[in-house]
Amino acid sequence: LSTLPPTADDAPGRAVRVGTALGLCSAVGYTVANSALRDVSRPDDFAWSLWVTLCKSAPVATAAWAIVAVRALRGRKALPSFAVWPRLMAAGVLAQLGGNLMFQEALGVLGLALTVPVTFTGIILSGAALGRFVLGEPVGLRQGASIVLLIAATASLGMAAPDAADAVIAQAVAGANADPAAVAFAVATALAAGCAYGVMGVVIRGNTAQGVGVAGTLAPLSLAGFLSLSAFLLLKTGEIPLTSTPPEARLPLLLAGTANVVAFFCIAAALQRIPVVRSNLLNASQAAMAGVVGVVWFREPPTLWLLTGTALTIAGLALLGLRRPRSIRARLSGRPREETFAEAVETV
């Protein structure tokens, strides 16, 4: 192995490797978080979904503002210009109410193995479209083919939705069956959640590409989302059910929040280094992970459609590969080196 330091010419390649590693770490973190969320999911309990989503979002806001505070005390630029705050805060509200909350609702009907890949259809399509037309990021042939495979995977997994929903509902209410209309609505909800996540990803990348650090970008975004969830919960129930949370749900909620904050920072840092489409496709590996966890741990039915969809997901990610197209490397080579996730944490 060479001990020579990397040259300036290798900077784009290093950015690709860092971004790829962060994207994969985010996938693992979100799989852990989503598994914990699946453990506490309840069908037809919107107020509970609000509370679970609030618990999930709180650590992100806390960590982001803690980093911002320390950076400010050290005299470093901590927050973006107030001119971009409305955009970030709107994305934060959309990500929580349209993303995390809808995702939690879908989990209570579809289960883990189906909700995650269906959500990624929305993420990939919205991220690809907005990345192309808003950020000017090209969608190459391999990425386009990967998108097609992942959409086919989601379609295959969607065919298993009725059986999966019956199993999930039966676990919550003995002998009950899922309403077909509720199943269709849950699929639409998961797709909508993915679109909300896709918009958030483009907003994060659009601002970090302008020199705004990870924590500075996430601080106003996560705060707006947390406040909107809190207000919605108070309007819905009139209370914040901190003391009334069942003891058996507290550890999964803590695990979900902790894993979510790690995954959130990883994906935000990855979006600094690699295009939205590539980051989303790497992070989509959690679809395969969710399928395994859903079947093995939560006893969701391992149908042929589920196995086919998981295989298509793996094929789509394998096609993507780990090398960045030359055109993207060339575009990055003239840019100054940006802050990595490790630097965002270590240099606060």
Q: What do the predicted segments below correspond to?
A:
Residues 123-148, 155, 288-307:
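C-terminal transmembrane-helix exit sites in multi-pass transporters
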Residues 31, 35, 93-97, 101, ...:
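Hydrophobic/small/kink-forming positions within alpha-helical transmembrane segments
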Residues 21, 55, 113-122, 206-224, ...:
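Helix-helix packing/entry segments at the starts of transmembrane helices
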Residues 64, 142-176, 305-324:
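Hydrophobic transmembrane alpha-helices of multi-pass small-molecule transport proteins
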